[in-house]
Amino acid sequence: MWYSAHAICYFSYFGQDSFLVHENVYLVEAGGEDQAMLIAKQVAAEHEDLSEDGHLEVNGNKAQYRFAGIRKLIEVELDSETGIGKLHSGVETTYSVLEVDDFSEVERLAAGEMTSVLYRE
């Protein structure tokens, strides 16, 4: 089975007053949900950057890139009706549920522009 693993990672540096957070989505193949979670944690942890040599900076501050955890794990629904039964173009691999205050925010979100959202999951 295939899973989409939503990993939360963040930048850490001395004296910060807010956190820049990334949600990285990894495609994981596993025999079940427990195994997928273990693999997802391993994959995400391998992307940490804990070096202190200064090559990674946030707002001029030496930073580290840290893995916080797996926020959600979603089983990818393969298209059984077509008989394909495998990953192919057009398969939905993940989703998110968001809420905004008005339609102009829907349009900004769809255009990739910054807007405020309420994450519903």
Identify what each model region corresponds to.
Residues 1-5:
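Short structural boundary motif marking the start of a folded domain
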Residues 15-19:
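Short consensus segments that form the blades of beta-propeller domains
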Residues 20-31:
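A short, exposed loop/beta-hairpin motif centered on an aromatic-Gly-Thr core
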Residues 32-45:
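A short, charged, amphipathic alpha-helix used as a generic interaction element across diverse proteins
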Residues 6-12:
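Generic short beta-strand segments
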